[in-house]
Amino acid sequence: MFVQILGSAAGGGFPQWNCNCVNCAGFRDGSLRAQARTQSSIAISDDGVNWVLCNASPDIRAQLQSFAPMQPGRALRDTGIGAIILMDSQIDHTTGLLSLREGCPHQVWCTDMVHEDLSTGFPLFKMLSHWNGGLSWNRIELDQSFSIPACPNLRFTPLPLRSAAPPYSPHRFDPHPGDNIGLIVEDLRSGGKLFYAPGLGKVDAPLLEIMAASDVLLVDGTLWEDDEMQRRGVGTRTGREMGHLAQNGPGGMLEVLEQLPRQRKVLIHINNTNPILDEDSAERAELVRRKVEVAYDGMSIEL
């Protein structure tokens, strides 16, 4: 199985266009040693030719341009994207579908709740129906694994996660199973398993067992502290209110990952305020000590 990190930042990317927090300002003036990052999206393949796109970020055009296998050049109009999975209906995970309209129809896998959001509050399915058939919906059943013809050697298993629907959603304050999912992706040939959850608000005992049975954990790295947005003076909501488990503190992501010594551990969906973006920070050094990696645009993983 091939996993390509197309984008590794949270919504807004890094540096965020309108932000002058210590990270964004430091990156712009050159005083901060860090890498620019686009908004979160990955691609998965069983052969390196045909790819399943997981989330379509607003930065999708630049992301595809930077990864040559996404343009195999077999015809005058071509793409390596064989299917698209939407983990949720967040703006920063779905807006890229608009930029992919020239390639419609696209096979899109998502839950009932995500499809509902993208047919009402942010009606992408209706909007894109005017482009060569638009988006062909394939329902993700929460209690069933599924396969995708573009990558027949991979099995996808959805995991309903405790998180939050987007601010535009008609049920923003009425959460439902399927608002946000994680994925177990298993290579049926090698047995390798990827656990992918860019939006993870809580890890309970059953989910921890699932993570322990995986080989690579690609998990929510949004915030270092739960009140980070407040500390940085750029927001009022906590990580938990936004559906993101912070790395630091009791019950935080690092405490969870400490219980999983065998797995390769990688943080993704990193907010522009997170001090781990600073490669010289104490927080980044703590991740190195714990053998927890920080995803970056262009990172490749094989398992």
Curated annotation (Swiss-Prot):
<dbReference type="GO" id="GO:0018189">
    <property type="term" value="P:pyrroloquinoline quinone biosynthetic process"/>
</dbReference>
<dbReference type="Pfam" id="PF12706">
    <property type="entry name" value="Lactamase_B_2"/>
</dbReference>
<keyword id="KW-0884">PQQ biosynthesis</keyword>
<keyword id="KW-0813">Transport</keyword>
<protein>
    <recommendedName>
        <fullName>Coenzyme PQQ synthesis protein B</fullName>
    </recommendedName>
</protein>
<dbReference type="InterPro" id="IPR011842">
    <property type="entry name" value="PQQ_synth_PqqB"/>
</dbReference>
<dbReference type="InterPro" id="IPR036866">
    <property type="entry name" value="RibonucZ/Hydroxyglut_hydro"/>
</dbReference>
<dbReference type="InterPro" id="IPR001279">
    <property type="entry name" value="Metallo-B-lactamas"/>
</dbReference>
<comment type="pathway">
    <text>Cofactor biosynthesis; pyrroloquinoline quinone biosynthesis.</text>
</comment>
<comment type="similarity">
    <text>Belongs to the PqqB family.</text>
</comment>
<comment type="function">
    <text>May be involved in the transport of PQQ or its precursor to the periplasm.</text>
</comment>
